[in-house]
Regions:
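Active-site core of bacterial EAL-family cyclic-dinucleotide phosphodiesterase domains
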Residues: 137-199, 236, 297, 354, ...
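Conserved helix-loop-beta segment at the catalytic/binding core of cyclic-nucleotide signaling proteins
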Residues: 28-59, 293-297, 350, 360
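EAL-family c-di-GMP phosphodiesterase catalytic domain
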Residues: 53, 183-186, 238-245, 264-279, ...
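C-di-GMP signaling machinery
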Residues: 96, 112-157, 167, 199-206, ...
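Catalytic-core segments of nucleotide cyclases and related cyclic-nucleotide turnover enzymes
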Residues: 63-67, 80, 95-121, 139-142, ...
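Catalytic core of bacterial c-di-GMP phosphodiesterases, primarily the EAL and HD-GYP domains
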Residues: 168-173, 203-280, 356
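Conserved long alpha-helical elements within nucleotide-processing catalytic cores of c-di-GMP signaling
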Residues: 5-32, 42-46, 50, 59-67, ...
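A short glycine-enriched loop-to-beta-strand structural element that forms part of the catalytic core
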Residues: 43-52, 80-115, 122-128, 230-238
Length: 399
């Protein structure tokens, strides 16, 4: 068992190192009183301990020991008149791990406690190999992302999906979508955006990666305008780029570099990316409005999306989530809800783009509902720059 005291730093900061050392000794004493003759406790480092069970104990035994220790510590806290209130988190690994070598054992020990602490205070986690493999894969992907960015964004690619005017059925623009692949033992693997984009955000690598995608998309917009003069490009922006970077400056630089009209570069964000009008977000929105850059709410209809969001964010248009669209096409109840949202949104001068259009019948229904723009596999799947130019430079033919 790998044991860690939760928020021990706060005890040291508020009461001093002397009292902190007293807590360390007391916690060790409390735990020792809970152990059998076949169990040993060792102080590992700082606020961490290791309990070794020399018997073939089960997971249930580990849970029981954890509860016993927790009760003992709770009594200690009461006896100390609540001078320090704390808990412990415990990660449990099988003793067989010791046979795998010191380094592997250390890694799994650290992983188990980290997982326990990620559950909140008083966490308890029993090592699971599948969880560990996910953890290792996450580390490999992060390392590969860093290396790719350093090496001129090798592995990153921009895919484009057409956006079509609902009434004329003519292509008016595209959404730029970040894609990433990495070399593995089996060959090149395309990593799902659902997997690598959160890692980019978590590490802050979304700032340089997002800047690269933005410039590639702006260059593509400039290229497409040779064939479709009013072509517009939609780019996605993360809350991390707003909080930690200077994405509004990046957007303005891209517009200037490729001599684009501001209204031709649309900025998309999902509602979950909004930050309750923090100073950084307000500055970002004001910069877009001041320079005439359209702002788009993506994936509307998911989570707790509401019309207050549209009112407060004042977007140029909203994109109805593809799952919401599919439900509306297959359920009368959802269809009525979908249909009635459209005039409400239009009433405040906000346009609507329906995502996830996959069939001609869906196109016709959207036209009846007076949706403004359409996007989905019916018009084309996301594809690379070369293929997109070949397919759409001369427009799009919808029957």
């Amino acid at each position: 068992m790998h044991v860690g005291i939760d928020d021990f730093g706060a005890i040291n900061s508020s009461r001093g190192a002397g009292y902190g050392n007293y807590i360390l000794r007391s916690v060790a004493g409390c735990m020792k009183e809970c152990l059998s003759d076949k169990q040993r406790i060792y102080h590992l480092v700082a606020d961490q301990y290791v309990i070794v069970d020399l018997e073939a104990s089960s997971a249930e035994d580990a849970v029981a020991l954890k509860e016993k220790i927790t009760d003992k510590l709770r009594n200690f806290i009461v006896a100390e008149n609540y001078e320090a209130i704390f808990s412990i988190s415990i990660g449990v690994i099988d003793a067989a791990t010791f046979c795998e070598g010191t380094e592997e054992c250390r890694k799994k020990f650290e992983f188990a406690l980290k997982q326990a602490k990620s559950m909140g205070k008083n966490g308890f986690y029993i090592f699971d190999q599948d969880d560990y493999e996910v953890f290792l894969r996450k580390g490999r992907i992060i390392a590969t992302l860093r290396n790719a960015i350093v090496n001129h964004y090798d592995g990153f690619e921009v895919y484009y999906q057409p956006i079509v005017d609902c009434q004329s059925k003519q292509i008016i623009g595209a959404e730029a979508l970040m894609r990433f692949s990495m070399i593995t033992e089996e060959g090149r693997e395309f990593v799902s955006p659902m997997e690598f984009i959160p890692l980019l955000e978590e590490t802050g690598l979304i700032i340089p990666a997002g800047r690269y995608i933005l410039n590639e998309a702006a260059a593509m917009c400039c290229e497409m305008q040779k064939y479709i003069p009013d072509f517009r490009m939609n780019v996605n922006v993360s809350y991390v780029q707003i909080l930690q970077g200077n994405v509004e400056r990046d957007i303005l630089d891209a517009i200037q570099k490729y001599s684009l009209q501001p209204e031709c570069l649309c900025v998309e964000m999902t509602e979950s990316g909004f930050m309750d009008m923090t100073p950084s977000f307000c500055k970002f929105r004001k910069t877009l409005d001041k320079n005439g850059i359209p702002f788009v709410i993506d994936d509307f209809g998911t989570g707790y999306s509401n019309l207050h969001c549209i009112r407060d964010m004042n977007p140029s248009y909203v994109k109805m989530d593809r799952d919401f669209t599919a439900k509306a096409m297959n359920s009368n109840r959802d269809y009525e809800l979908y249909k009635n949202i459209i005039p409400m949104v239009h009433s405040i001068n906000v346009r609507i783009c329906a995502e996830g259009i996959e069939e001609k019948e869906w196109l016709l229904k959207m036209k009846e509902m007076k949706v403004d723009y359409l996007q989905g596999y019916y018009f084309g799947r996301p594809c690379g720059k070369k293929q997109f130019l070949q397919q759409y430079a001369s427009g799009i033919n919808i029957k």
